[in-house]
Amino acid sequence: MIVFLVFKHLFSLRLITMFFLLHFIVLINVKDFALTQGSMITPSCQKGYFPCGNLTKCLPRAFHCDGKDDCGNGADEENCGDTSGWATIFGTVHGNANSVALTQECFLKQYPQCCDCKETELECVNGDLKSVPMISNNVTLLSLKKNKIHSLPDKVFIKYTKLKKIFLQHNCIRHISRKAFFGLCNLQILYLNHNCITTLRPGIFKDLHQLTWLILDDNPITRISQRLFTGLNSLFFLSMVNNYLEALPKQMCAQMPQLNWVDLEGNRIKYLTNSTFLSCDSLTVLFLPRNQIGFVPEKTFSSLKNLGELDLSSNTITELSPHLFKDLKLLQKLNLSSNPLMYLHKNQFESLKQLQSLDLERIEIPNINTRMFQPMKNLSHIYFKNFRYCSYAPHVRICMPLTDGISSFEDLLANNILRIFVWVIAFITCFGNLFVIGMRSFIKAENTTHAMSIKILCCADCLMGVYLFFVGIFDIKYRGQYQKYALLWMESVQCRLMGFLAMLSTEVSVLLLTYLTLEKFLVIVFPFSNIRPGKRQTSVILICIWMAGFLIAVIPFWNKDYFGNFYGKNGVCFPLYYDQTEDIGSKGYSLGIFLGVNLLAFLIIVFSYITMFCSIQKTALQTTEVRNCFGREVAVANRFFFIVFSDAICWIPVFVVKILSLFRVEIPDTMTSWIVIFFLPVNSALNPILYTLTTNFFKDKLKQLLHKHQRKSIFKIKKKSLSTSIVWIEDSSSLKLGVLNKITLGDSIMKPVS
């Protein structure tokens, strides 16, 4: 007895020792794990920068996922794909569904000759079968794809109780009896997609207790009831893509407690209710894109505590409740793209702490701000309609789009060609206009009022060159780190002043060209009229044009709530809008300027020059010097053509883009950059050539100046040679000097006569 007690005591002591030893080991392991976790803490980076894995180095967003190893350890090129949500898991499961290697041996004794058999799996694809064939009852997989089976009668599979998978795609099945799947208690996967099914009777799946996958895609099914899914206690995945459903059952998951994945893409569902997903506690993936859902009640998703991915894209949702996503604490991926949403609440995504991917493509967000996206600390991918929106989510590693056609994450001007052109056109514009101003000031013109108008036009065009120079300068300033300063830049005073300068130059130039055209029109078409503005009237008109241009450019500054950031919609600060993302005020104003004032001015210029050419041609036919008149006609036609052509190059692209935007046609982003940098300044660069350098008056005056300069040079040379002769004669004889003076005097008198 004593021995037993001693043994029992020792055994208890050993158990206690082992318990403490195990506890100590666990503590060590936990400590080690904590240390490991602590050592993996990523370095804190400033806004817009992201860490290089476990290195202390941080890089701007532009250097991540750009195809180059900028970190040195490849961390900046890792995790670039948007793998959040459950799409990857589904692909893996779906892809490996039939991955088990089968032997070529067939274990079925009876099956049609047109079928292929491997072990207990039978494939009868494209066999022209009109009904389910007679086969051995030990079959586990039956594929009857692409046959001519149009109906499934009662108990058609009653003998095949071991069936686990049935594939009935592409048969144009129209009718399925209520007891067609009777007895299939082991069936796990059922494919009925790409058929002609219009209705499914309640209870049709009541014996399919083990069914996990049900695929009903591409069938013209118009209605489903809650009782349709009776018996589907194990259903995991339900797909009804591209059906004709207009409504969902009152409680979608009442008969499917294990339902994990629902795909209802491409139906005609018009509404959801608070009870639609009330019993869908296990749901992790919900796809509802390409439907006609106009409104989602606030508590629609309140019971979906485990939801990991939600897709509501391409619907007609115009407004979201501020607390719609409040209960989706585990949501990883949310797609709201291609909805006509006009407003997002500032706390719309406040509860989505685990969200990793947010898709807001083709959505206008007029009230966008950085606070809207700050709560989503785990957000790694975000998709916007506008590139400039990326500035409001600097903490997100991957932001799309990468450019707006003008700027990129790295540079204000994303295209190397644009960088070169902006300097070339700026130089040509400034130099050409300053040269004309100088020459016009130096050369005295008979028509001083016209010369004054041309000089004022050159001043306006020169402002466009100054604007382009500033674009080039700020491009250099922000080279390689533009996205870091993009938001500050577009909201800065400098950007707004640049936009104001460009708009002032553009509108004053347009109004001046219209005035000069009308002035010329009156002279040529009505040569005997007395409608001729004098110097004072011309000065008043020019002052009014500058005041009108100034007002057009400055009005957007008066009411920011109405116009928004009118000049800060893109990196080059020019208000050339072409999409639906602008404020109502700025949209109406820009349309009024570009399709109102500028289009009207362009049409007046084109009409005037056509009328002038016809008038000149008519006058020429009445003269006798046909040959000379023909030459003059060609010259005038060429000149008028290039004037109209330069206006067309400048403004037609703008008009086309604005008109297309009215019809909601998507315009390529790159088009904006070419219009702003290349097409729009064409007039400013060519006006000096067209209105001064190629005119006959300027050519004649230039020839006179050159001739006068040549005469002065010749006179200086002769005078120099004369002085040499006089010095030599003085050394020789005073008599010769007098004779030479007479000869020289005679030469000088005779020269003008000759």
Curated annotation (Swiss-Prot):
Q: Which InterPro entries match?
A: GPCR_Rhodpsn, GPCR_Rhodpsn_7TM, LDL_receptor-like_sf, LDLR_class-A_CS, LDrepeatLR_classA_rpt, Leu-rich_rpt, Leu-rich_rpt_typical-subtyp, LRR_dom_sf
The record lists its disulfide bonds as 45-58, 52-71, 65-80, 495-573
Bilayer-spanning residue ranges: 417-437, 456-476, 496-518, 538-558, 593-613, 640-660, 671-691
Q: Which residues lie on this side of the membrane: Extracellular?
A: 1-416, 477-495, 559-592, 661-670
Please give an example of a GO cellular component term from this record.
Answer: plasma membrane
**Where expressed (tissues)?**
Expressed mainly in the brain, kidney, muscle, testis, thyroid, uterus, peripheral blood cells and bone marrow.
Print the keywords alphabetically.
Cell membrane, Disease variant, Disulfide bond, G-protein coupled receptor, Glycoprotein, Leucine-rich repeat, Membrane, Receptor, Repeat, Transducer, Transmembrane, Transmembrane helix
Task: Give one Pfam family, short name only.
Answer: 7tm_1
Q: Which GO terms of the molecular function aspect are on file?
A: G protein-coupled peptide receptor activity; peptide hormone binding; protein-hormone receptor activity
Question: Mind telling me which Gene3D superfamilies this protein's record contains?
Answer: Low-density Lipoprotein Receptor, Rhodopsin 7-helix transmembrane proteins, Ribonuclease Inhibitor
* Residues covered by the LDL-receptor class A domain: 44-81
Topology of the protein relative to the lipid bilayer: Multi-pass membrane protein
Domain of life where this protein originates: Eukaryota
> Which family, according to UniProt?
Belongs to the G-protein coupled receptor 1 family.
Q: What does this protein do?
A: Receptor for relaxin. The activity of this receptor is mediated by G proteins leading to stimulation of adenylate cyclase and an increase of cAMP. May also be a receptor for Leydig insulin-like peptide (INSL3).
What this protein is called in its record is: Relaxin receptor 2
